[in-house]
Amino acid sequence: MKKNKRLMVMAGGTGGHVFPGLAVAKQLQEQGWEIRWLGTADRMEADLVPKHGIEIDFIKVKGLRGQGVKRLLAAPFQIINAIMQARAHMKRWQPDAVLGMGGYVSGPGGIAAWMSGIPVVLHEQNAVAGLTNQWLSKIAKKVFQAFPGAFPNAEVVGNPVREDVTQLAAPTERMQERQGPIRILVMGGSQGARILNQTLPEVMAKLGDDYSIRHQAGKGSAEEVNAAYQANGVANADVTEFIHDVAEAYAWADLLVCRSGALTVSEVSAAGVGAIFVPFMHKDRQQALNADHLVDCGAAKMIEQPDLTVESLTQQIQQLDRQALLTMAEQARGAAKLNADRVVAQAIVALTEKR
């Protein structure tokens, strides 16, 4: 017979879904809750979640966007099968609530929870709600959104951000006395970003020794990107596939050049670092909309991908001296919502106390 309250987190695919889920999970673990994860075996959660001491159950589910006719015809059967798999996991473990953080797994998982009478809590990380969360919002007991506009009446709480990022020293304390080369941190998300990998080596060649760079290239790309820096005469580039201590990297940086996925935008703000965002080209401009509020308040610049060239990025970076970067960093920190993980965790506790 179980004693502690139990939460099943449904999240997968990318760091933008998984890391916020881990942040909420940590809040509840500190209150004595047991946490289990629902994910897919072939995405990053399969490796990442167990490293945080959380057991994970898998279901078989894939996205439908861009699939051929054959896959689309088979989709209803695959979705039903995924719902049944999720329901079996929930029946065995008996969670008191489930938290949907996005990714393909959330749809079948949310429906399975609803069918089982388990309260569903949703958090939408992006400024434009994904199709899965649009559906699940109709059956969820509580819906949160990171940015205004994803849902008409949902509470705006920001994105749950890792505690080591929120606890970084203030920008003034970190940056005011810095001297030497301006430090550029390039992050394309956990999967990297090809256009940043291709553009930055040439940009750094133009910028010269007044700048230093650390570059997260993404899985399988570090060797190629490092070779591009070498070919452009940039000998001191620090290139890695994945930055594990992201808080330390933010603390090191004077400027980020990055995509504007939901988690990245929230972490940039929480850390207090100025950024040049290059949004991924979604049809609905999701990433551009994620970053708009930081651009509007002077915390960031944005170059839309069709406008990104070696020249345009070089020019934008050269316009930002240390004082401008410090001002951007302070504006970013001032815009941050730092308690999303606690707010979501408290809502889950309150929901289960009513049962």
UniProtKB/Swiss-Prot annotation:
SUPFAM superfamilies reported in the protein's UniProt record: UDP-Glycosyltransferase/glycogen phosphorylase
**Annotated GO MF terms:** UDP-N-acetyl-D-glucosamine:N-acetylmuramoyl-L-alanyl-D-glutamyl-meso-2,6-diaminopimelyl-D-alanyl-D-alanine-diphosphoundecaprenol 4-beta-N-acetylglucosaminlytransferase activity; undecaprenyldiphospho-muramoylpentapeptide beta-N-acetylglucosaminyltransferase activity
| Compartments, record wording | Cell inner membrane
UniProt key word Cell wall biogenesis/degradation: yes
Q: What is its main location?
A: membrane
**UniProt entry tagged with the keyword Repeat:** no
Superkingdom, according to UniProt?
Bacteria
Reaction(s) catalysed by this chain, per the record, are:
di-trans,octa-cis-undecaprenyl diphospho-N-acetyl-alpha-D-muramoyl-L-alanyl-D-glutamyl-meso-2,6-diaminopimeloyl-D-alanyl-D-alanine + UDP-N-acetyl-alpha-D-glucosamine = di-trans,octa-cis-undecaprenyl diphospho-[N-acetyl-alpha-D-glucosaminyl-(1->4)]-N-acetyl-alpha-D-muramoyl-L-alanyl-D-glutamyl-meso-2,6-diaminopimeloyl-D-alanyl-D-alanine + UDP + H(+)
The entry's keywords: Cell cycle, Cell division, Cell inner membrane, Cell membrane, Cell shape, Cell wall biogenesis/degradation, Glycosyltransferase, Membrane, Peptidoglycan synthesis, Transferase
UniProt pathway: Cell wall biogenesis; peptidoglycan biosynthesis
Instruction: Please state which protein family the record places this protein in.
Output: Belongs to the glycosyltransferase 28 family. MurG subfamily.
**What is the protein name stated in its UniProt record?**
UDP-N-acetylglucosamine--N-acetylmuramyl-(pentapeptide) pyrophosphoryl-undecaprenol N-acetylglucosamine transferase
What is the species listed in this Swiss-Prot or TrEMBL entry? Vibrio campbellii (strain ATCC BAA-1116)
- The gene designation is murG
